Amino acid sequence: MNMFLLLMSLYLLGSARGTSGQSDESSGSIDHQTSVQQLSGEFFSLENPSDAEALYETASGLNTLSEHGSSEHGSREHTVAEHTPGEHAESEHASGEPAATGHAEGEHTVGEQPSGEQPSGEHLSGEQSLGEHASGEQPSDEQLSGEHASGEQPSGEHASGEQPSGEQPSGEHASGEQSLGEHALSEKPSGEQPSGAPISSISTGTILNCYTCAYMNDQGRCLRGEGTCITQNSQQCMLKKIFEGGKLQFMVQGCENMCPSMNLFSHGTRMQIICCRNQSFCNKI
């Protein structure tokens, strides 16, 4: 009878532990084996009926405590299902510790755990709020940096706007140089004009009436185009003699600019140029 009660109590304890999961079953089976060995050792060590009655009372007390523990464990499965130290305290309570102490320890452990977890949760929430505050400050810094960049952009545009204004004086400077160049060009002919004036004044002092003839024979007689010309500026009276085959063919006389004295040869024809300075007739036969 006593063995039947022990087996029933162990069965009830095993069924109460079976609902807590596989990890609880392994720890509960170890605790059950320990309690079975302890109770069997106590049973075999007893010899008198008074000890059997005490064992019966102990087994019935354990049954009551196990039922009480299983009911409390079922009511607190959702709260303490994942808390291993609390279940360990309850397993120690099932292995033979006093129910009030184990229950008080279980409640103390369970009670302390939420209170301990609550500051940790608040700490996490505080860290989360600090993280959110940091994350909130980060966009503000980025916003300030963005505003700073956007503030710098108008300054860049202002600099780019100032660049054409800086180019405009350079253009005015170039146009000013161009106008100065035009002024220098306009002054240059005026400078050349006085240089030409002395030549004209010099040449005007030696104005001559040059005898002209389009065709003159070798004897100095004008056959065609007889007349006179007035030397102006640097003009001089010039005589051209054309020879063919070594014989004088005809002569031409007139007013020419910058008269050089030279002999020209071309295909058996020779042309002799004679400049008559300050003379009206150069033909001297």
UniProtKB/Swiss-Prot annotation:
Residues 1-21 form the signal peptide. It is found in: Cytoplasmic vesicle, Secretory vesicle, Acrosome. Residues 85-184 are annotated as: 7 X 5 AA repeats of S-G-E-H-[AL]. Its main location: cytoplasm. Residues 66-95 are annotated as: 3 X 5 AA repeats of S-E-H-[GA]-A. The keyword Signal applies. GO terms for cellular component: acrosomal vesicle. It holds the Pfam family UPAR_LY6. Sequence repeats lie at residues 66-70, 71-75, 85-89, 91-95, 110-114, 115-119, 120-124, 125-129, 130-134, 135-139, 145-149, 150-154, 155-159, 160-164, 165-169, 170-174, 175-179, 180-184, 190-194. It comes from the Eukaryota. Glycans are attached at residue 278. Testis. CDD domains: TFP_LU_ECD_SP10_like. InterPro entries: Acrosomal_SP-10-like (IPR052671), LY6_UPA_recep-like (IPR016054). Keywords: Cytoplasmic vesicle, Glycoprotein, Repeat, Signal. Residues 69-95 have a biased composition (Basic and acidic residues). The keyword RNA-binding does not apply. Residues 64-200 are annotated as: Disordered. PANTHER family: ACROSOMAL PROTEIN SP-10, URINARY PROTEIN RUP /ACROSOMAL PROTEIN SP-10. This is Acrosomal protein SP-10. It comes from Papio hamadryas. The lineage of its organism: Eukaryota, Metazoa, Chordata, Craniata, Vertebrata.
